[in-house]
Regions:
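Short, aromatic/basic amphipathic alpha-helical patches
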Residues: 28-43, 139-142
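Active-site-proximal specificity loops/subdomain of glycosyltransferases
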Residues: 35-89
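GT-A fold catalytic core of metal-dependent nucleotide-sugar glycosyltransferases
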Residues: 80-138, 180-181
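A glycosyltransferase accessory/donor-loop signature
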Residues: 158-160, 165, 169-171, 175-336
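Short, charged/polar "capping" segments at the starts of alpha-helices
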Residues: 24-32, 132-134
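Histidine-anchored nucleotide/phosphate-binding helix
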Residues: 1-11
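Short internal beta-strands
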Residues: 14-24, 125-127
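Short, surface-exposed amphipathic charged segments that create phosphate/polyanion-binding patches used
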Residues: 58-71, 138-142, 239-245
Length: 336
C-alpha cells in the first residue's frame, strides 16, 4: 500500500498511521511486519492490537456476539469482522478512518479517498457488480441466498432476511472490504448501538453478517465511492474497470485467493509483492506446497509461473530459505 501512496497533498506532508487488528498473531510475525514496514518509516507508523488479549469493552463484546453466529458464519468468518461494528469505540482518537480487508493488493494511490467529503454519510464504500455472478434482479439475489442457506445448512426461520430486505441489499450492493468511516457521525448518532441492536434480532439468520447489517441499518446514508477503491480482479476489463491502471485496490473476496493457486487472476502480481516482504520464505514454501495445482495451468500460465520463479531463485534467497527450513526443524524439535 505505502509504495503506491502519495507522500504529500497540496504541499502538506502526509503520514499514514496503520492499526492492525489481529487475533493471536505471534511475536515473530509481528516483527516481520514491522521489518516490512521499516523502509516507509519516514511517513508511516504501525501498531498492533490483539483482540484476543484485550479486555477492553469493544473486544469482549465482539467475543460475545460471535457466539451468536450460525455454524456456517462461524466457519467462514472470524470474529474480527464484528470489530467493524465497533470502530468508533475501538478508535476513539479519530474522527475519520479508512478500513480495509487483508486479502487485498494495492496497485494505486488511495490517499485521495480519505479526503472525500462525507456529506452526512456514515461511511463510504463501493458497490459490487452483481452481474458478474449472474444476479440481475432482487429475485435472483433472493433465490441465490436461499440456495446458499440450504447448501450451508443454515435453517430458515424468523431471523432470516425477508424478500424486502434482500431487495434493499440488491439495490445497495456495497462491499465492506474498503470503507471510509465517519467516526464522528457514528458517535453523534449512536450508530454502534443501532448496529448491535439489529444484529441481536437477526444474528444466526445473517449470511454476510456485518456487510448486511451496514446496508440495512445505514441505507440512505452510505456514500457510494468510485469502484477503483475496491476492485475484484474479475472486474478488470469490464465497463467498470477497463484496465488495471484504473484500480487502486484489488480485493480478492470470494474463493479465488491468489496464494491458493497461481492461475487465479493477479496471483502473479500478488506474489511479486509478497516476495518483497519479510515473509518471502513462507511465500516460497506455500508455492512449493501448491505445486500439484500447476498441472491445471494452461501453457501461458505455466510459462508465466516458471519465468516468475526464475527471477526469485537467486543464491542469496536460496541460502535464506535453507536457513529458514533449518530453523523451523529446530523449532519443531525443541517444542516436542
Amino acid at each position: 500500500m505505502l509504495s503506491s501512496c502519495a507522500q504529500e497533498r497540496d504541499g502538506v506532508k502526509l503520514f499514514y498511521q496503520i492499526h492492525c487488528l489481529v487475533d493471536s498473531l505471534s511475536a515473530e510475525n509481528i516483527e516481520k511486519l514491522k521489518r516490512t514496514m521499516s523502509p516507509f518509516s519516514a511517513f508511516s507508523g504501525i501498531e498492533f492490537c490483539d483482540i484476543s488479549k484485550n479486555d477492553a469493552y469493544p473486544f469482549t463484546l465482539v467475543s460475545q456476539l460471535f457466539l451468536r453466529f450460525n455454524p456456517f458464519a462461524k466457519k467462514r468468518f472470524s470474529k474480527m469482522i464484528l470489530c467493524r461494528l465497533l470502530l468508533a469505540s475501538i478508535f476513539p482518537q479519530y474522527e475519520k478512518i479508512i478500513m480495509f480487508d487483508v486479502d487485498t493488493l494495492f496497485v494505486g494511490d488511495i490517499s485521495e479517498g480519505f479526503f472525500t467529503p462525507m456529506d452526512g454519510a456514515y461511511f463510504g464504500a463501493t458497490k459490487e457488480d452483481l452481474s458478474l455472478i449472474n444476479i440481475h434482479s432482487a429475485n435472483d439475489l433472493f433465490v441465490s441466498r436461499l440456495n446458499w442457506s440450504r447448501g450451508m445448512g443454515v435453517k430458515l426461520n424468523h431471523k432470516s432476511l425477508t424478500f424486502q430486505e434482500v431487495g434493499i441489499l440488491y439495490e445497495n450492493p456495497f462491499n465492506a472490504g474498503f470503507m471510509l468511516v465517519n467516526l464522528a457521525l457514528w458517535r453523534e448518532s449512536h450508530l454502534e448501538e443501532k448496529l448491535i441492536d439489529f444484529f441481536k434480532t437477526r444474528d444466526e439468520g445473517l449470511l454476510l453478517p456485518e456487510q448486511d447489517l451496514f446496508v440495512l441499518v445505514c441505507q440512505g446514508r452510505i456514500l457510494e465511492m468510485p469502484c477503483k477503491y475496491n476492485v475484484h480482479p474479475r472486474m478488470v476489463g469490464t465497463r467498470m474497470i477497463p484496465k488495471k491502471s484504473d484500480a487502486c485496490m484489488l480485493h480478492f473476496y470470494a474463493d479465488e485467493k491468489p496464494w491458493k493457486h497461481f492461475g487465479y487472476p493477479y496471483s502473479k502480481e500478488w506474489h511479486q509483492v509478497a516476495f518483497k516482504t519479510s515473509f518471502e520464505s513462507l511465500v516460497f514454501e506455500n508455492l512449493v506446497g501448491k505445486i500439484e495445482t500447476f498441472t491445471e495451468l494452461n501453457d501461458h500460465n505455466k510459462k508465466s509461473f516458471f519465468e516468475f520463479l526464475n527471477t526469485k531463485l537467486n543464491k542469496k534467497f536460496l541460502i535464506q530459505y535453507i536457513l529458514f527450513k533449518i530453523f523451523k526443524k529446530l523449532e519443531s524439535f525443541c517444542l516436542r
